[in-house]
Amino acid sequence: MTELYTAANPAEALKLVSLPEDELFVGATQLRRATFDNRITLCAIINARSGNCGMDCRFCSQSKHNHTPIETFSLLPDDELRGRILALGTQPVARIGVVTSGGALSGEEFDRLLGVLRSLPEYVLKRVCASLGKLSAVQLAQLMDIGLDRYHHNLETSRRYYPSICTTQTWDQRKATVERVFGAGMTACTGGLFGLGESWRDRIDFAFALKSLGVTHVPMNFLHPHPETPLAGQPPLTAGEALRIVAVFRHILPTATLRICGGRPLVLGARQKEIFAAGANALMTGDYLTTQGRGLVDDLAMIDSLGLEVDCDQSC
């Protein structure tokens, strides 16, 4: 393989899948370093509204179509939400994500959230991003006007495979939301979930769809099977396959931020350190929405042990 090789089309990307792991990782590491050097960015999220979602996503513990025993609650009180954002603002995280379950916030909830965000000091607000479901162009413009420049909305998987995991919203509807994010002048944090039963071709088509949309911030999650969901019995990915997915994505999206998020402790286990060799340059630290993550202290120690450095630049 030549230095800084990238996959220009799905056929080239499929050839990468069968490469020896060490060869694949060498190329992925070179590509990561070419754009990000040894800088790693962290983000953390706040579960601001949990459960009772009307979507029927087969993997999701928050869907009311499933019966996973999780804590459910409406939008956090304003003071509590503000306090949790400010607390994360003291940590070395480049981004603080406010996440709500469900297809969309009500008008009253959205206005409340805007009020909380407006009350934040600028040095914290500029690090906040939001994941609030399907928003209109007007709502996205309101977020942009108060200082939010990034919005999270996943496509989850390939357009072909998506109907296998959700029927209450189409892939094209999700794509339209991402396009509205760009139309509002914001950057989109858009990725998905792996280990749903999708094929390698689905994964590669998904990566090229993100590239076609111009997505430059890609959260990568690995299925953590939840009880009482249709995918409760789905075997988790092996660590080797999960790392290979990251490396192939790096060859398709050479300059994008690849952020390893949900499922990291379960799927990668003792191989978590290898995410950077596989091409990732960012990770989510702390707990996820309804599952336990890895603590900030442990993640900082891991990054330091590898001779890498934490970058708090919110543009990453």
UniProtKB/Swiss-Prot annotation:
Entry keywords, A to Z: 2Fe-2S, 4Fe-4S, Biotin biosynthesis, Iron, Iron-sulfur, Metal-binding, S-adenosyl-L-methionine, Transferase
GO terms (BP aspect): biotin biosynthetic process
Protein family per UniProt: Belongs to the radical SAM superfamily. Biotin synthase family.
Cofactor field: [4Fe-4S] cluster; [2Fe-2S] cluster
GO molecular function list: 2 iron, 2 sulfur cluster binding; 4 iron, 4 sulfur cluster binding; biotin synthase activity; iron ion binding
EC top class named in words: transferase
Subunit structure: Homodimer.
Residues reported in the UniProt entry to bind [2Fe-2S] cluster: C129, C189, R259
Reaction(s) catalysed by this chain's protein: (4R,5S)-dethiobiotin + (sulfur carrier)-SH + 2 reduced [2Fe-2S]-[ferredoxin] + 2 S-adenosyl-L-methionine = (sulfur carrier)-H + biotin + 2 5'-deoxyadenosine + 2 L-methionine + 2 oxidized [2Fe-2S]-[ferredoxin]
Reported function: Catalyzes the conversion of dethiobiotin (DTB) to biotin by the insertion of a sulfur atom into dethiobiotin via a radical-based mechanism.
Protein's recorded name: Biotin synthase
Species name: Desulfovibrio desulfuricans (strain ATCC 27774 / DSM 6949 / MB)
EC numbers, comma separated: 2.8.1.6
Gene: bioB
Every Radical SAM core domain range: 36-264
Lineage: Bacteria, Pseudomonadati, Thermodesulfobacteriota, Desulfovibrionia, Desulfovibrionales
Gene3D superfamilies: Aldolase class I
Keyword Cell division part of the UniProt annotation: no
Cofactor note: Binds 1 [4Fe-4S] cluster. The cluster is coordinated with 3 cysteines and an exchangeable S-adenosyl-L-methionine.
Binding site for [4Fe-4S] cluster: C53, C57, C60
Functional pathway: Cofactor biosynthesis; biotin biosynthesis; biotin from 7,8-diaminononanoate: step 2/2
Pfam families membership: BATS (PF06968), Radical_SAM (PF04055)
